[in-house]
């Protein structure tokens, strides 16, 4: 999948070195297709690392994706420079009138606090409410998943006796759901958290379905039955060395962390861990983009754009009356479908092309 990012985003060089197709705005414009608009609310402390991880995870289908990074106005990042945020991120106020095909809400290192104690909870709650009407499908990761389950369904989180950290085995529970299509029956995925949500609370909500869980790590993947809200209580996007970096960070802080489970060879914290979960991560995000974003989103995200197309349809009716009024393009919907997704035109056309006819 070609990922559209700003030309000088630091993650670009890393991804290009991995042979991942990255485009800037000029190249994307020349392709004459409507990209999927994905909004990423990055709450992780090391934002540049998370940018790379998520863009990598989104890069595995032929669809073009335009990623917008969102920052909170009620929180000041301690680990990412203001210049980076000002250059590559947008505020919620600047985009809240837009609609997006998909959204990702990341985890955050605030899980030992009650949700209402988090200094940006009110702003985050407003964003999660906004997703109901402005986003086709939203993925929540780790603490973001716990926050989403709490906000949307009132499902609580519980503190664990010790941190859950490592690579855990999981089992798919319902293979008929497209989100887990092509998953193995069992798969590995990283977890890194102090809190958890529990099966018995989720089962009280028939509008939710549990898709994967682990005997050791608990719930991994939950989805609303309409596919609009997806909750991942793990970190499938993590790099090979992310858990290693977290372990040594906590060690240097004097926290006496346990070694991540099933991660280091022979439990040697100075060995290079084996990457055993990348295929799962790629499959999860590819399925999400294909089945819950691309196949479900309207071609035109904004009502204003739809009105412009209807106006253009009626103008063309007057210009080519026989073809449009009495032929197979006899209403604006068919007209729009033809010009945006038709083998007859040879390519998908953008709104600007439709309006220039």
Model regions: which residues?
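Amide-donor transfer/coupling interface in amidating biosynthetic enzymes
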Residues: 1-74, 88-95, 99, 126, ...
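Conserved beta-strand hairpin/beta-sheet module of binuclear metal-dependent hydrolase folds
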Residues: 75-87, 96-102, 110-113
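Cysteine-nucleophile active-site neighborhood
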Residues: 100, 105-174
């Amino acid at each position: 999948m070609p990922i559209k990012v700003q030309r000088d985003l630091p993650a670009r060089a890393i991804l290009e070195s991995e042979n991942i197709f990255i485009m800037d705005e000029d190249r994307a414009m020349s392709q004459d297709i409507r990209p999927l608009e994905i909004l990423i609310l990055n709450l992780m402390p090391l934002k540049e690392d998370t940018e790379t991880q998520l863009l990598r995870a989104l890069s595995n289908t032929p669809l073009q994706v335009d990623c917008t990074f969102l920052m909170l106005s009620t929180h000041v990042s301690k680990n990412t420079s203001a210049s980076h945020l000002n250059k590559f991120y947008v505020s919620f106020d600047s985009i809240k009138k837009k609609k997006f095909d998909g959204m990702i809400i990341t985890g955050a290192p605030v899980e030992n606090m009650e949700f209402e104690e988090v200094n940006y909870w009110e702003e985050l709650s407003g964003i999660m409410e906004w997703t109901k009407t402005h986003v086709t499908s939203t993925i929540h990761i780790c603490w973001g998943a716990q926050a989403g389950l709490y906000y949307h369904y009132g499902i609580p989180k519980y503190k664990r006796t010790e941190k859950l950290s490592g690579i855990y085995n999981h089992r798919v529970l319902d293979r008929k759901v497209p989100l887990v299509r092509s998953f193995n029956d069992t798969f590995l995925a990283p977890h890194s958290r102090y809190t958890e949500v529990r099966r018995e609370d989720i089962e009280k909500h028939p509008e939710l379905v549990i898709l994967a869980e682990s005997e050791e790590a608990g719930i991994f993947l939950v989805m609303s039955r309409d596919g609009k809200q997806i909750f991942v209580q793990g970190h499938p996007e993590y790099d090979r060395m992310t858990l290693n970096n977290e372990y040594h960070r906590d060690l240097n802080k004097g926290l006496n962390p346990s070694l991540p489970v099933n991660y280091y060879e022979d439990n040697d914290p100075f060995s290079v861990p084996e990457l055993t979960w990348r295929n799962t991560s790629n499959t999860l995000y590819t399925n999400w983009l294909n089945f819950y974003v691309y196949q479900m989103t309207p071609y035109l995200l904004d009502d204003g754009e739809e009105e412009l197309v209807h106006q253009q349809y009626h103008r063309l009716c007057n210009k080519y009356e026989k073809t449009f009024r009495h032929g197979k393009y006899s209403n604006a919907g068919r007209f729009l479908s033809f010009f945006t997704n038709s083998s007859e035109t040879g390519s998908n056309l953008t709104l600007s092309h439709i309006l220039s006819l």
